[in-house]
Amino acid sequence: DFVYMLHDGRKGRLHGIRSEYTLLYFYDPDCPDCRHTREMLAELPTVVALVQSGRLQIVAFYPDGEAEAWEACRNIIPDTWLNTCDGTEELVVREKLYAIRAVPSLYLLDSEKRVILKDTDYNKLDAWLNGPLSASL
């Protein structure tokens, strides 16, 4: 579990997110690969359907703690995602809660916030989502 901060200053906890699946999208606003991943996630039909149904919550998480950079990129994250940054002075990175070797980094979690896919990419995520979940979309 970790604390995140929203643009309006409110804080939340990962375990407070109520959805069947949670996708953690660790990014840097200046990273071209992060931009590409964000654009692909926003267009994948399965991801879009799951987000719209409320079964998937995407948490865009800027882990570097640079508030100015995060504020400047507020409009690049889709409105249907939680746009967050580290609310505890880089605790997520410092305490190594997630192995973020580089960005972008994607983690798919189940409803209990257990890791299903670790440090994956959007192609593997899409393949997994189209496996067990495709019949229920």
Range-by-range predicted roles:
Residues 1, 21-22, 103-104:
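Short loop/turn microsegments at loop-to-beta-strand junctions
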Residues 1-5, 15-19, 47, 68, ...:
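N-proximal helix/coil linker or "cap" segments that precede and/or mark the start of modular domains
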Residues 4-5, 82-87, 119:
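Short acidic-hydrophobic, aromatic-tinged amphipathic segments that line or gate anion-handling sites
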Residues 12-41, 57-59:
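Short active-site neighborhood of thiol/selenol oxidoreductases, capturing the structured segment around
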Residues 35-75, 89-95:
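Structural microenvironment flanking redox-active thiols in thiol-disulfide oxidoreductases
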Residues 57, 80-82:
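Conserved beta-strand segments of alpha/beta enzyme cores
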